[in-house]
């Protein structure tokens, strides 16, 4: 998976990885969606300006510099209301754009400098505060702008590889995700009309500060053009997988719509 060569993303029907789970909660995989240390691409495939995939993009509206990429991210990335009522900012709210999470060979996530294929990336953290006998549900949203579409596709491929390589992953001290199931649905009807590829992971989340767990965990990642959009939901006491997915899906879908509006051709 680390060699670049000609990259073909055949839809992955289902990959089930048994893992122990642990105690995750903060950002790790959830914040950066995929941040594994990647081999730098050797020969890049040149892309035609009009080769814009599902979104009918205007080449002039596609970012080509870090500054343009951060500006676009600011117009696309979720805020609390994007998820729905009751969701608030969590501190720290935004990540440092100069870093992103990288999954090491020891299956521990650490902050490192983004790969050279990344123009800009940003994550935001949210939560539904504890109330009514339920613990705090933690949410995150991430938007990454790559230099090329192939770079974004490579992120999707790496995400599947990471789940298979590390069925249990440490997000930070006392936080783990495990028992992961990953499903890549490609462009199947009804998934995400504006996404070229879509990956859903679900599993178990453990957090020592929240009583251990395991609790439900969901992670949505989609790719369109040179962009990837991700949302993570981490449960706590009293939260069901379905409740987490409702909020995560709402934010993920909204960001995809915003992305299309930001780069598509204008009549």
Summary of predicted features, one role per range:
Residues 13-16:
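C-terminal motif of bacterial Sec signal peptides marking the signal peptidase cleavage site
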Residues 139-142, 226-235:
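Short, well-ordered beta-strand elements
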Residues 1-10:
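N-terminal export and membrane-targeting signals
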Residues 18-21:
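Bacterial signal peptide processing site
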Residues 233-250:
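A short acidic/glycine-rich loop-to-helix N-cap element
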């Amino acid at each position: 998976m680390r060699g670049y060569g000609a990259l073909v993303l055949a839809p992955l029907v289902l990959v089930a990885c048994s893992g122990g789970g642990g105690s995750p909660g903060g950002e790790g995989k959830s914040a950066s969606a995929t941040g594994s240390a990647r081999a730098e691409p050797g020969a890049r495939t040149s892309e035609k300006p009009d080769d814009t995939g599902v979104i009918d993009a205007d080449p002039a509206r596609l970012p080509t510099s870090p500054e343009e990429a951060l500006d676009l991210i600011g117009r696309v990335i979720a805020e609390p209301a994007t998820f729905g009522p009751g969701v608030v900012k969590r501190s720290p709210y935004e990540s440092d754009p100069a870093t992103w999470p990288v999954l090491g060979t020891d299956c521990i996530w650490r902050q490192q400098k983004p790969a050279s294929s990344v123009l800009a990336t940003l994550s935001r953290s949210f939560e539904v505060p504890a109330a009514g006998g339920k613990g705090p549900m933690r949410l995150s949203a991430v938007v990454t702008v790559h230099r090329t579409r192939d770079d974004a596709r490579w992120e999707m491929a790496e995400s599947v590889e990471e789940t298979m390589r590390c069925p249990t992953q440490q997000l930070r001290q006392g936080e783990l995700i495990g028992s992961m199931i990953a499903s890549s649905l490609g462009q199947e009807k009804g998934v995400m009309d504006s996404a070229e590829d879509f990956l859903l992971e679900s599993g178990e989340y453990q957090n020592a500060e929240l009583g251990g767990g395991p609790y439900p965990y969901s992670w949505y990642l989609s790719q369109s053009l040179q962009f990837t959009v991700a949302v993570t939901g981490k449960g706590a006491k009293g939260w069901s997988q379905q409740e987490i997915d409702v909020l995560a899906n709402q934010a993920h879908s909204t960001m995809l719509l915003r992305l299309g509006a930001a780069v598509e051709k204008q009549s």
